[in-house]
Amino acid sequence: MAHWPLLVVGLSVAFVSSQAADPAAPSPNKLPKIVVDVAHKGFMNEKGERFIPVGVNYYRPDTGWAPQFWKKMDVETTRRDFQKMKELGINVVRVFVTYGSFYSQPGQLDAEGLAKFDQLLDIADEFGIYVHPTGPEGWEMMPEWTNPLGNVHANHGNEVSLKSLEDYWTMFAGRYRGRSTIWAYDLKNEPSVIWDSADSQKKWDEWRTAHGQPFVPVPAKDAEPSEIVADYQRFRESLAKAWVARQAKAIKAADPKALVTVGLLQWSVPAQPVTLDQYAAFRPEVVAPHLDFVSLHFYPLAKGIYRYTGPDAENANLSVLESMVRECAKPGKPVVIGEFGWYGGGPLDPGGEPASEDQQAEWGKRLVEVTAPMVSGWFNWGLYDTPEAKDVSRLTGLLTFDGQEKVWGKEYAPLIKSMPVPSGIPVRPDLPWGTATVDELASERFQAEYLEAFRNAQP
């Protein structure tokens, strides 16, 4: 999830290698392998039958915040959760792998974490649910050896950190090579390239030299729009591209049939105003060639917190969403909404009216319907409401914290399963990337133009 105080948060999961765990033969596959359906920009099984990911981000409400799922994993509780997900119609779970449970030491994966992941895969097989591992993430701890600059967002151009990630994927994907229960690997939850770091000037100098340009210092975060600033944004995009490409290559070398994506922060598409450094630099058209599909996360924050105040506010957020999905769809790969959800009101929004379950369900329905022409799968943020969370995770679940089915939980899977094959990218204004990454006013103008086109297209 996007990192907004008291609003949204993201997660990730970790895994272990055969070098660090019992090299016993893997469990036999019980689920058919899911592959990309190139013709329909979606997914299918190896028999050619359509597969629509009806997904959920899985963590438990009784494991702390950030969730310490692996350290507190209970097999029977996990099995009951998968039973509930099966009853809800869920067919894929996104889980967050952590350094603390899976990759606490360089060069090896943790046997205890791998054993727990093996158990989770066996449970998933039992209930016919695929697993979408994300990570590794620093929720439980971030080892110094993989975070040499002391800031996870500063590591995208750091060779030590990137090599540790390549090693991780080589071990993890190698251990689970051919395990069809794993739907796809997500490289990381919501990566964003930091504006400036200890490595930035050196890397920037190298990039400028390679393009035949003279030395200039790293621009200030509040610099006025200029060609130098535009170049620096392209430089940041090049770091994101290399970071994705090297990890994807490591996974494919270990398991050629594995699917790979990365969970994009919505600020990867500057369709609404973002500051120079807030732009995540994971531009879809730049990273998509190295991915099997594009995964976008979205929360309704157009012009501030979405408060269910009427059609104008709803359309403002849906138009921003559609414009972002549109940019994700342009590279021609399948698109998935890897995180979404909203509730609003009450303690999450002081001064805002508490929202209802019906409003949560209506927002979810509109999000799915608006994105369906370009999207092939959806992942709700959270199975359960999570009272201890510091963001919308408190109330975005399909179930209440004590396991009662909510309105959205009842409607979610039937709605997604009714969605047709994606029909294509709608005719709308194109995002002016050249100016939107350097000038907030350009994004504001685009947002207004797109909103008008979106409104005019509504039935």
At which residue positions do the language-model features occur?
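Active-site flanking residues adjacent to catalytic metal/cofactor-binding acidic residues
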Residues: 185, 189, 296, 338-339
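Substrate-binding surface in catalytic domains of secreted glycosidases
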Residues: 302-323
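Active-site mouth of glycoside hydrolases
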Residues: 28-291, 330-331, 344-347, 353-355, ...
